[in-house]
Amino acid sequence: MRSVWLALLLPGVAAVALAAQEFHPPPVRSPGDGTRLGLLGFGVRGGIDLSGKTQLVFGVTLDAGNLLTSRFRLRPSGEIGVFNGENSYIGSLEGLYRFTGEGQAATPYAGGGFSLVGHDRCGADPDCPDVWLNVVLGFELHYRSTFNWLLEYHGMGGFRHNRFYAGLTTRRGN
């Protein structure tokens, strides 16, 4: 009789012990943490260059991803400056630190980078193309869920070129 009770009790205890085990999956990193590269958004902008020959400047930017944190962004861009002298052509790569997170009414940022600069008569100019260091200050104003207005200042080439921009930028949802 004891062996019958033991035979019934052992499988019952084992079933309860197995049911009591709880699966704990490994923690999953949120998509906002760490490095994330890819085309996450783009923007268009226009403005003026207040150097000696004031030029009208048009450009496009790409949001190429985050480095180390969701607040540090990689941003390549291209620009064309027209009127008042030779047309200028600029390709830039900048790193921008955003002081607030996503979804704020205003998002200030600052950063820097470098530009490869040319102009219409670059072939005849021994100093062309040139490399400039950039300082960037700006902020985005929330417009729609994935669109922001952009207001920005660029000090370029040792602050010999001071550019002010206004534009519209988008970022794909996280």
Region spans (language model):
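Cleavable N-terminal export/targeting peptides
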Residues: 1-32, 174
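Transmembrane beta-strand segments of Gram-negative outer membrane beta-barrel proteins
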Residues: 32-48, 108-110
